[in-house]
Amino acid sequence: MSLISRLRAVVAGDDYLDGELDDFAYEDEQQDQDQRATQADGGALATLGDSNPFDLGGDLPGSNVIGMPGISTAAAEVNLMEPRSFDEMPRAIQALRERKTVILNLTMMEPDQAQRAVDFVAGGTFAIDGHQERVGESIFLFAPSCVTVTNASQDETSAPTVVSREIDVAEPSESASAPSPAWGAAAL
């Protein structure tokens, strides 16, 4: 029976091919019976002997796993860029999107353009959950989220910037007491 006649029979509502056996279902039933017989003879260990779950030799049929683009087991790639203008910054963002680490040497750029470039690439790095680190004077490292950046000398070289107003140390009694109210103490 051809495919078209089978489709007509199903659509027309003929009791599924007028009682004809489906060849495919018969083979499935036969395979199920064979598996039951194997399990009854040797138990669950017989089925484990047929296939090794740790065998990585071949692909599993019907596997739904696909690789991530840009991820490889090869060595990580680092791009060193010495841009002369801001127009070259999209190349740095593209490299980060391809999961490559970027080192920007901005000594060839004007200071205002270099600041703009760092802000642009830092924004792109933030968008992909990456990391940024200042390596030296006008040299910056930008890494994607798959790369871990550690700085062994971070404790010695950088400290958080604390902004505070200067307090006159000559009069310690005033700094210890509460400030006078804005409406004036003389009115009370």
Curated annotation (Swiss-Prot):
It comes from Synechococcus sp. (strain CC9902). Coiled coil: none annotated. The gene is sepF. Belongs to the SepF family. The lineage of its organism: Bacteria, Bacillati, Cyanobacteriota, Cyanophyceae, Synechococcales. Residues 29-53 are annotated as: Disordered. One of its GO terms (biological process) is FtsZ-dependent cytokinesis. Transmembrane segments: none annotated. Cell division protein that is part of the divisome complex and is recruited early to the Z-ring. Probably stimulates Z-ring formation, perhaps through the cross-linking of FtsZ protofilaments. Its function overlaps with FtsA. This is Cell division protein SepF.
